[in-house]
Amino acid sequence: MALMSQAGSSHCIYSEKMKCISGHSSITSNMEMLKMKDICFGNISSRNSSKPMQGIYLDRVGVERRRGRLAIVAASPPTEDAVVAAEPLTKEDLVAYLASGCKSKEKWRIGTEHEKFGFEFGTLRPMKYEQIAELLNGIAERFDWEKVMEGDNIIGLKQGKQSISLEPGGQFELSGAPLETLHQTCAEVNSHLYQVKAVAEEMGIGFLGTGFQPKWGLKDIPVMPKGRYEIMRNYMPKVGSLGLDMMFRTCTVQVNLDFSSEADMIRKFRAGLALQPIATALFANSPFTEGKPNGYLSMRSHIWTDTDNNRAGMLPFVFDDSFGFEQYVDYALDVPMYFVYRKKKYIDCAGMSFRDFMNGKLSPIPGDYPTLNDWENHLTTIFPEVRLKRYLEMRGADGGPWRRLCALPAFWVGILYDEVSLQTVLDMTSDWTAEEREMLRNKVPTSGLKTPFRDGLLKHVAQDVVKLAKEGLERRGYKETGFLNEVTEVVRTGVTPAEKLLELYHGKWGRSVDPVFEELLY
């Protein structure tokens, strides 16, 4: 996932030359953070906890300072081999980790991630792992990316702050760098698609921009050689009926956005959750399953309702007066674990408790205690509609064609990065009940913008929200409003992308889904 914990994190105690456990010197890169004082959460410990906050400093290159001891924490988990714990983590440490994401407004960035389905032009069948490996190697060699390996298998690429990774069924994911403007975001997407196509087309491979695999069943999807996915694959059927579909047959586009303080995080979290069903409707793009209409406009969104309700959903507690970083930590601690990573291997801990882990009582590795990398890994196994890490992830949209990959971050940046639009949304949604939010979340995958809401349709609310997003982008002053054109047309007509595909299926396509591979080809 795109990591937006770049230089500028505001939870900083020291900034000095430090002698690390390895014996090497490391100089922290965030001198300016000393000036930020308690912009982020100087009052958290007094408001949310009886214990004083432990001093943690976690910078971009992964140096941790805690209780006067030093340890190296590698920047890209899982890399537990680099961690030497001074003493067991406390709950306060976990809270401080989330709070370390706070940034002053001038350091806010946009991190966009998208997934896509690779397929063979001749057969429309999903890419096999061997083809994916050839593609990754080709991109690495031609465009100077660094290879990411798991054992002998190539499983991804890195270049600067961008990374390419593989979802369980070979879905090809770009996790973009933290960027300042939507122009940069769209340029990054275009550059990535150019590079992928340059290699893939020579192999007879294309990529499809949709939210759910339209033609092939689970048995037809290849399994990627990644240890964490094997653990998830074994666990999913125990906790929901659609978890394997989520893993192997869905694609999304999401944006990761920053916050300045705990209070700012809360406001953005609430606005994001309230409006997430609107984003789901605007980007609904997964109406086909195994060659036929599936009864949904966003099958991808529906799948999350029966994947694992311990780790998905609309998080009603975010709207409680007591909500803050500490309450999210309490929630995350109660989400069952999937795995820990030790000695270059994933250890199955599915269903076990992170609280037990913190007490050294995790049965597969008794006496072992978690590191911040373990905590970061655990946070990536939680899948609500909006997810908190050291930034907020908006997770409600289906994958789609490249213009929509630019429109999704534009929608959320216009709302969440503009104070006037954000406050207007909070005022607009302040009297929405938890039951209404849940109703929208459950009905939108089927009825989209035609979902009844109060005395009208969701379309009418969406029109107001898209207008607020546009006004927010205008106030940013970067001439970014054009990126909203895709969703402006959707709210004008009330017709979602999925409904357009269904119209083609029943008409021009002669009840075949095969043409969708051309219609939504990148």
Curated annotation (Swiss-Prot):
Catalytic activity: L-cysteine + L-glutamate + ATP = gamma-L-glutamyl-L-cysteine + ADP + phosphate + H(+)
Subcellular location per the Swiss-Prot or TrEMBL entry: Plastid, Chloroplast
GO cellular component: chloroplast
E.C. no: 6.3.2.2
Disulfide bridge positions per record: 186-406
Gene Ontology molecular function: ATP binding; glutamate-cysteine ligase activity
Protein family according to the UniProt entry: Belongs to the carboxylate-amine ligase family. Glutamate--cysteine ligase type 2 subfamily.
Name recorded for this polypeptide: Glutamate--cysteine ligase, chloroplastic
